[in-house]
Amino acid sequence: MAKQIKTIDYDSENDIFSINNGEKVKASIDIGDFVLDVNHNNFICGLEIMSASENLGISKDVLRNIRSMKMSVNYKTNHVYVLLMILFKKEGKEVNVPIPLTLDLGHKTPRKEMLIYN
């Protein structure tokens, strides 16, 4: 079952995009311009992207106008694959943004999880 994304925030002045599902954060992991928040079960519960417009290839104006969003997370034994599916208010179109990350969160078996905001 999909988890609900509780908050989406875009700070256009600092160009920082963040989402979280409201779970308590055990640790934050910095990977370049990306910060992953991990819960006590070692699952991603939040994501922060610095220089978001550049890293996502999306204008600041568009990032201010997100209507809905899904974040698919595939946990493998030695990496995590995050896919953001963003629907924008103005254009009414959806953009898929893949974020492959090499990160071992200690998962012994592959698992997929979906977080949704609408």
Per-segment meaning from a language model:
Residues 1-31, 40, 51-118:
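Intrinsically disordered terminal and processing segments
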